[in-house]
Amino acid sequence: MKGSPSKGGFCPDAATPLLGRGVAFPRESGCVLGMNILLGIFQISLEQGLAYALVALGIVVSFRILAFPDLTVDGSFVLGGAVVARMIVLGYPPLAGVFLSIVLGFAAGCATGLLNTRLRINSLLAGILIMTILYSVNLRLMGRSNTPLINYTTLFTPFEETEARWLWVTLFFGAIAFGCKFQTDQIIHPQLGLDKRAKGANEQMKRSQGLNTDHITVLGLGISNAFVSLSGGLVAQHQGFADIGMGIGMIVAGLAAIIIGETLLRAKTVMRNTLAAIVGSFVYRLTITVGLWLGLAPTDLKMATGAMVILALGLPALKRGKEERFHLRGI
């Protein structure tokens, strides 16, 4: 079968496009999975993985370091896309929109933290409340449920004119993802960061030493949602639109990426946890891409992701229960 080049990579004839501006994969029976197809799968997975790595990195800060089940993520991701889309449509530079998305994402995370620490609202409920409020805020920002950016200048417009578009876009996402990872490591390793990690592990001990864990929680959630909002702003520009539903299931996808990464890297330190978020994001997107190529319906992706997380979280408990039963039986 002959193939023809495309913007995203190798596109065999009679192929079904995947993920819009990405690579197209063959759907005809008997088509040989050649090196070009493998390269295409790798390219789109790496590009998408690095684009969403900031979501996983933000969830690492809230779930792993702060031990705070923050559900604001689904709303703050859309917030980033909505802010950037609105700013670009109004004629502002894309970089200004990205900066504002970071600021507002940080504010959204801090709001969740303040509801929990000042008003003593349950952590899950605090996240749900802010996420619900953000739904209306995002609609107000965009003015409608979907804002296309195809005909506007974005941060990725200069890459469209280059032959190695995929390479430059991947390097761009990679630089941002690893830059945020190293900044997170620098924040965590000094004394404030050690307090954050201890806050999640033993809050009563830190309070007994006179440390204000409430401030740590608010700051940590702000940083977490700033990362997520930044990711939303970049993804909206990359895919060419911002949509009110683009954040649905984002927290589950981020958790899946973290679980995969921590399993592969056996992450037991903060630096490994942040690296696991990036690696896991790539592997997760690789799994999704391969699943789509094999015929998995796009409508089933959320269900498959949820099942993956349930399996990963439930297996250790089942294993421990089995070992305890064997121990009681004297086996």
Functional labels for PLM-detected ranges:
Residues 23, 27-55, 83, 90-96, ...:
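Membrane-interfacial amphipathic/re-entrant helices at transmembrane-helix boundaries
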Residues 40-93, 98, 114-119, 259-266:
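Single transmembrane alpha-helix segments in multi-pass membrane proteins
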Residues 59, 92-132, 137, 178-179, ...:
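Alpha-helical transmembrane segments within multi-pass membrane transporters and channels
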Residues 64-69, 110-150, 160, 240-244, ...:
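Short loop segments and helix-boundary regions at transmembrane helix junctions
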Residues 108, 163-251, 256:
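Helix-loop-helix "hairpin" substructures at the membrane interface of multi-pass membrane proteins
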Residues 123, 127-130, 134-189, 218-219, ...:
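Transmembrane helix-bundle core of multi-pass membrane transporters
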Residues 183, 201-208, 212-215, 268, ...:
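Cytosolic-side transmembrane-helix boundaries in multi-pass membrane proteins
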Residues 228-303:
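Transmembrane alpha-helical segments in multi-pass inner-membrane proteins
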